[in-house]
Regions:
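Ordered, small/hydrophobic-rich secondary-structure cores
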Residues: 1-2, 209
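Gly/Ser/Thr-rich beta-alpha loop segments that engage phosphate groups in nucleotides
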Residues: 46, 85, 115
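N-terminal charge/polar-biased segments
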Residues: 16, 31, 259-265
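Serine-esterase "nucleophile elbow" of acetyl-processing enzymes
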Residues: 3-81, 96-108, 124-132
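Alpha-helical cap/lid subdomain in secreted, periplasmic
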Residues: 97-241, 245, 249-263
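N-terminal post-signal-peptidase region of extra-cytosolic proteins
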Residues: 86-97
Length: 265
């Protein structure tokens, strides 16, 4: 409906456009730009979004990014939404707000994977087709009984990368945070699924890739399982403030190792 209205409004000779309401473009709430300062938009799930009152509460790296980035040089906008996958972040309009807010020179960090693994058409219905192939399929949603086209993890990532570049921004693909699960003294890694798929899309598109998953996992391996518990919040996925700050600092470390201009900020 929105696209139809936009089409009508763009036709100068079409009388019907006078009956349209003013078109509203959704943007990121609370964004205040300062001259000469690029904006970093953080997109993702709860591991990026969360903020809490207590140190050992649930925290996301986007909420504490100020510990790793100089806010006198960049503006930080945490646009992540808890519980979202690439698919639901797009379908619910969260991505549109970011897209409409991007200006040339801005950075968009794209970090998903934890919720993309979920069911596609049952329960929370937020999962995607596994892999990076340019694949789609029509599924019947159990809750609504409506049909919906669902794409692959790689398709959604490539769309995000393309959209950011279309606006003159710089996309940065960030692999998902590691979970606090251990085997034989080493933390669990997802280098065979969502971690490697993020890397593959970066290689396909030429986008900057920060392997946060392994950067943080390497650090926690050195800390050991007992000490690593302090970086998480009572479950295997969500981090405490200490853990969120670690992820933010590892992200900054990855940017520096990649010689990203943003690392100077």
């Amino acid at each position: 409906a929105g696209s139809a209205a936009e089409g009508i409004a763009s036709c100068k000779k079409l009388e019907l456009k006078k009956y349209l309401k003013p078109l509203q473009t959704p943007v990121v709430n609370g964004l205040k730009r300062k001259k000469g300062k690029p904006v970093i938009f953080f997109t993702g799930d709860s591991t990026v979004k969360n903020a809490d009152k207590e140190e050992d509460g649930m925290w996301g790296l986007g909420s504490v990014a100020g510990c790793a980035f100089d806010t006198t040089k960049v503006t930080l906008m945490n646009c992540a939404v808890a519980g979202r996958s690439t698919r639901t972040y797009l379908d619910e309009g969260h991505w549109d707000r970011v897209y409409n807010s991007i200006q040339p020179g801005d950075y968009v960090f794209i970090q998903f994977g934890h919720n993309d693994i979920g069911d596609i058409n049952t329960k929370k219905a937020r999962g995607v087709i596994r892999g990076t192939a340019d694949t789609s399929h029509v599924y019947r949603m159990e809750a609504t009984r409506k049909y919906k086209v669902v794409y692959s993890f790689g398709w959604y990532l490539r769309k995000f990368v393309g959209d950011v570049r279309e606006k003159g921004g710089i996309p940065v693909l960030v692999s998902l945070t590691p979970r606090n699960r251990w085997k034989n003294g080493k933390i669990e890694r997802r280098n065979d699924t969502y971690g490697i798929w993020m890397r593959e899309v970066a290689e396909q598109t030429g986008a900057l890739f920060i392997d946060l998953h392994n950067l943080t996992a390497d650090y926690l391996d050195k800390e050991g399982q007992e000490k690593a518990a302090a970086y998480y919040n009572h479950d295997h996925t969500h981090t405490s403030k200490k853990g969120a700050e670690l992820n933010a600092k590892m992200l900054a470390k990855g940017l520096k190792e990649a010689n990203c201009p943003l690392a100077k900020s």
